């Protein structure tokens, strides 16, 4: 069972979850220190109310900031000696939240639908999808990414 106290010094998502990249690094170090096995990080990301703009884009800079900060801390954990097998964001495509349905979005790719209307179900790359693709092409974070 996990218990904790809220940290008023940390920023929070639209849904009240703390954003703690340094805590992510500390957790990676603690798990690796205990088990001494390589780690595979899956579903690291942020849920938000993403909005399809009139020009057909989704500007999710908050997701880019979140991913950049967490990936940077993961790189520092690797420098600390933590073995990382791989990393995947949460998630490639929007999915249905068990609590907020279709309004809470997680993916790098937007699905054009809402709670009450399937609309055209188009898949639209968010700004974060382009950013993540560039990061992969460069094999990691750089000043440009």
Annotate each PLM feature.
Residues 1-145:
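Non-catalytic scaffold segments within catalytic domains of secreted glycoside hydrolases
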């Amino acid at each position: 069972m996990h218990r904790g106290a809220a940290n008023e010094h940390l920023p929070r998502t639209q849904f009240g979850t703390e954003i703690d990249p340094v805590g992510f690094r500390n957790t990676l170090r603690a798990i690796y220190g205990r088990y001494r096995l390589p780690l595979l990080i899956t579903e690291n990301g942020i849920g938000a109310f993403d909005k399809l703009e009139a020009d057909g884009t989704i500007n999710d800079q908050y997701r880019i900031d979140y991913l950049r900060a967490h990936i940077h801390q993961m790189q520092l954990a690797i420098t600390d000696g933590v073995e990382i097998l791989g990393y995947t964001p949460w998630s490639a495509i929007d999915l249905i939240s068990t609590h907020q349905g279709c309004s809470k979005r997680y993916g790098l790719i937007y699905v054009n639908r809402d709670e009450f209307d399937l609309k055209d179900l188009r898949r639209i790359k968010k700004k974060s999808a382009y950013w993540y693709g560039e990061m992969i092409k460069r094999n990691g974070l750089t000043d440009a990414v």
